[in-house]
Amino acid sequence: MKIIRVQDQIEGGKIAFTLLKDSLAKGAKTLGLATGSSPISFYQEMVKSRLDFSDLTSINLDEYVGLSVESDQSYDYFMRQNLFNAKPFKKNYLPNGLATDVEAEAKRYDQIIAEHPIDFQVLGIGRNGHIGFNEPGTSFEEETHVVDLQESTIEANSRFFTSIDDVPKQAISMGIASIMKSKMIVLLAFGQEKADAIKGMVFGPITEDLPASILQKHDHVIVIVDEAAASQLD
């Protein structure tokens, strides 16, 4: 695991984009993408660039259960607004949050991941150490699955909704085993509220109580953090 410290989120996005360009030059064809505030500066760099992504495939980590793609809080909407509308890909995959059978949808998504091995996976990290929507206690062997979101995650995401009561209580998420199959992982974390999770991920025991700790076992992980998020690493 390599740690890169940056001044702020803007610099973090630039460095992540440089890593992406290197990966594309080596033949990367499938990107694993994340939502939330952490990757936004990275997506801004992609949008500003002259690179053409029309031969690439993207696979997103997760989607809320119960939100249509037209909901402005769906991750499908987020990705279109922040990246896909400006930079079309050959194919974009996200879980279907309105699937009538969400368990079958999870299995369908695993098949997509199997058919499109991820070359470059972007991650954020939750305050409780979750990656994707893999909450503490999630088995490291889990593949795509339906998640009951923890109260801390619902609270953290409530800032994007009119009311905390409007935050979906479930999501479909790529599993930890799925994430670990990615050839390269770039995790972005900014802000003091991520410091405890980053410390546990880097130095703590590998435990399902802190899902991101499994990344210690991955061969190619780069963690991009600002000084606040890195404040407990010294």
Swiss-Prot record:
Gene3D superfamilies: 3.40.50.1360. The active site is at D62 (proton acceptor), N128 (for ring-opening step), H130 (proton acceptor), E135 (for ring-opening step). CDD domains: GlcN6P_deaminase. It comes from the Bacteria. One of its GO terms (molecular function) is glucosamine-6-phosphate deaminase activity. Its EC number is 3.5.99.6. Keywords: Carbohydrate metabolism, Hydrolase. HAMAP family: GlcN6P_deamin (MF_01241). This is Glucosamine-6-phosphate deaminase. The gene is nagB.
